[in-house]
């Protein structure tokens, strides 16, 4: 609800489609994750994909390292709705097989799947079936000659690797692709993406690879991806965590939400607490986050434990609670309400008000006349 609107001029890029999800151009920045199950375990993989769908994943990548995994992918695709990207290396025949089974995007590096005729076979198949490709360059797997030329992964090395692959697709007259240049070092990744953003017009897939565990990886990704997104660079992203992939989607949306680029669900504004708090702020926020995971309507909710900053935050929130003695003040659309919440029942009362406001907003959207 804040009146202050940041200005982020988004980089101009071409638009492609991964299934029914637009990527690039003026499309919303898509949030992705990747399954970490054995792809041959169809039941486990489908279960994880559906869990990712529930928290808002736009696109999901699945590793397909073998022909056995390709056959499993066929069954997985039949049981899921979200667009699926097949992650493939070395064996071009796997790409051809998953294309038969309805894959929505191929993640390959044209340079590591063999001779020109094999690359052409994959590209021709992608053209015929209208399947986009992601070129995925990674600092940890640079070509040997580039390692020797630059001595170590550098932004220039990652750019040169990416442009090699781009040139292959250009030569084959294929333009339905996106590119990533990932590194585990934040500054290396950021500078590589900056160089790439100037060099090509295709959509960019952002990521800080092998970022780390849930906490450190989230921080690393927020810093790196936040720098790029604030500069208008990026059309889709994945937060890479050594954690439940569901957390990758949550963190991805939190990053976009923090930059006011794309909102999904409740944006909680909560104080870190001190001895002035009149109710259990931390417990309240944690409980509400769990209870309200199903809500996708964007909404700012402030939960502040005392009257020092509470009223000011509540004025720029959709709903707000400001701690008071035994009862706390309640704000709706930035206005103080006569109603006050019992401090020992804030969670239930606030959940009810949030759900009521969401229902009103969704109902208003449904009954709005079509112009």
UniProtKB/Swiss-Prot annotation:
Top-level division of the source organism's lineage: Bacteria
PANTHER family: 4-HYDROXY-3-METHYLBUT-2-EN-1-YL DIPHOSPHATE SYNTHASE, 4-HYDROXY-3-METHYLBUT-2-EN-1-YL DIPHOSPHATE SYNTHASE (FERREDOXIN), CHLOROPLASTIC
Its biological purpose: Converts 2C-methyl-D-erythritol 2,4-cyclodiphosphate (ME-2,4cPP) into 1-hydroxy-2-methyl-2-(E)-butenyl 4-diphosphate.
HAMAP family: IspG (MF_00159)
GO biological process: isopentenyl diphosphate biosynthetic process, methylerythritol 4-phosphate pathway; terpenoid biosynthetic process
Key word Oxidoreductase present: yes
GO MF term (any one): iron ion binding
Family from the record: Belongs to the IspG family.
Catalytic activity: (2E)-4-hydroxy-3-methylbut-2-enyl diphosphate + oxidized [flavodoxin] + H2O + 2 H(+) = 2-C-methyl-D-erythritol 2,4-cyclic diphosphate + reduced [flavodoxin]
InterPro entries: Dihydropteroate_synth-like_sf, IspG_bac, IspG_bac-typ, NO2/SO3_Rdtase_4Fe4S_sf
The protein's required cofactors: [4Fe-4S] cluster
Keyword list, A-Z: 4Fe-4S, Iron, Iron-sulfur, Isoprene biosynthesis, Metal-binding, Oxidoreductase
Enzyme class: oxidoreductase
Its EC number(s): 1.17.7.3
Record protein name field: 4-hydroxy-3-methylbut-2-en-1-yl diphosphate synthase (flavodoxin)
NCBIfam families in the cross-refs: ispG_gcpE, PRK00366.1
Cofactor note (record): Binds 1 [4Fe-4S] cluster.
Record pathway: Isoprenoid biosynthesis; isopentenyl diphosphate biosynthesis via DXP pathway; isopentenyl diphosphate from 1-deoxy-D-xylulose 5-phosphate: step 5/6
Protein's gene: ispG
Keyword Iron-sulfur tagged: yes
Residue numbers binding [4Fe-4S] cluster: 271, 274, 306, 313
